[in-house]
Amino acid sequence: MNSLLRQGLRLGCCLPAVQQQIHTTAVHRTFWEREKKSGYKTKLPEPSKKQMIMDGLRDLKEEMKLWRQEVKEQFESDPILVFRPGETDVVFDFKAPDVLDKWTVTTDADHGEGKSTATLELSAAGAGLFHGQVNSDHTKDGIIKRTGYANIRTKRVRKSFKRETTYDWTQYNMLVMKVRGDGRSYLINLHTEGYFDLMWNDIYHYVLYTRGGPHWQIAKIPFSKFFLSSKGRVQDRQGAIPLNRVTHFGFSVAAKKGMDGPFGLEIDYVGLEYDPSHREEFAYEMYQTPKYIVAT
């Protein structure tokens, strides 16, 4: 009897531990993200509560303007009903006031990984000029293997009172831009940051080939040509870009195969277009993969 009681006590001690291991939902302990910057923490000091209150009161006037504009648009209720072929709706225009405040410039040097430099300013022609130097020399810390990049990206689209939202481009199937480059290839980035942590770094890419020289070029790229990547790696499981969940737009340039040196990309505008003759939904054929191999 005493031995049975001792076994029962041992079993009772183990039950709480067993109960803690029971989950009602699937748990992924292998891949997860601690934060949206994936380890690239901001170097700015954490503001005090007093400073946060002062900043909030300072921004209140601007937020009220955004809120009034939202209410006005809601009452007007005047959406675009007819998307005419050949007509470009400009989304990012560098002739607009305070346009540079809506973009963020980053390089490998910002994270202590390289020596590249970049800036975004208005050119003599009144367009946005993304230029600088890309350098593939990296810090000799035994961790960083490749570097030499520069990016520009729009700030997160939002509503009033710091509410995050997304662009809705579902009615369009073409990305149109007027650019003037230096002969380099640039990467077009469409960020579709998801709700779950594994989707925070989802970006759709396509390559922009520039001719160089003094002449402008009109690039017209179907959205069906964009491919999915995460943290710089092209994903095995691909799919059409969710055009109702675009959070950022940007360009990247890299120094590879001895292409260190200056770069320059002049951007007049970036717009959207509906082409009824383009019926393709996704350009890349997928193959059937076994279960438990790729994101299944």
Curated annotation (Swiss-Prot):
One of its GO terms (molecular function) is unfolded protein binding. Keywords: Chaperone, Mitochondrion, Transit peptide. Disruption phenotype: Larvae are viable but most do not survive the late pupa/early adult stages. Surviving adults that are assisted to eclose display severe degeneration of myofibrils and mitochondria. It is found in: Mitochondrion. It comes from the Eukaryota. Transmembrane segments: none annotated. One of its GO terms (biological process) is response to hypoxia. Residues 1-29 form a transit peptide. GO terms for cellular component: mitochondrion; oxidoreductase complex. PANTHER family: COMPLEX I INTERMEDIATE-ASSOCIATED PROTEIN 30, COMPLEX I INTERMEDIATE-ASSOCIATED PROTEIN 30, MITOCHONDRIAL. Chaperone protein involved in the assembly of the mitochondrial NADH:ubiquinone oxidoreductase complex (complex I). Belongs to the CIA30 family. Associates with mitochondrial complex I assembly intermediates during its biogenesis. This is Complex I intermediate-associated protein 30, mitochondrial. The gene is NdufAF1.
